[in-house]
Amino acid sequence: MLYKRLSSIPRRETSFMRSANFSIFLSLVLILSVCLFPPAVTAKDREERYVVLIDPAHGGRDDGVRLSTGLFEKDVTLTIARLIEKEFEGSKKIRIRLSRMGDTDVPRSDRIREAIKSEADLFLSIHVNAGFDRESSGFEVYFQGFRTSTSAKGDKSASSEIVKDMVRTKNLNESVRFAKILQARMDKVFPRLDRGLREGPVLVLQGLNIPAVELEVGFATNPKDRKKLADEGMQRFVAHALSESIKEFF
């Protein structure tokens, strides 16, 4: 009887030790993840410039929505993107890259690939909205919602997913922070026409592992919005608001 009692102790200790070892391993993973994946905006060496990828929606055969005769969404978004790029010429802190330089077809996958290739710290996709009626107006800011993975199996897979979820959380927090900055700046362009921040699956943002937002800058179906967006002075105003948002973010 005594032998049986004594022989059962090592098994309980072994089980306990395995549990303790996994807890220690998990703690180390969490600590290392914080060291290896700091907040996105501090990941760059301070001697390097932050890279912002501006994505002017549509292009080439894809016109987007029509604002007036001969003027389409693809034209307005590219003009605004180029104006932003011009505002940062000579900047020692921030470098602007565009997902398309002219009126060309650029698949969504190539836009994402360019963000990854350029090691962008921030992604901003610019669009013009359209509604089912003439009353809808103003701007909207979208960011990719957070989704945890539930497919992990085993201790190592679970710890790996925890690290990934921590990175996703940081990117989401930074995306929301930038979205709020944009919201405040754009309110000066479209006063009292803020349609709020929108969370959800955004196609153009999927596959990105950096802070990223999509801006719907106004409604082509609304006469007042359409007139604003077709005006060159207003396009410069929008570009300046977005440039100031980028500066404030970093």
Language model features: what each stretch is:
Residues I24-C35:
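Bacterial N-terminal signal peptides
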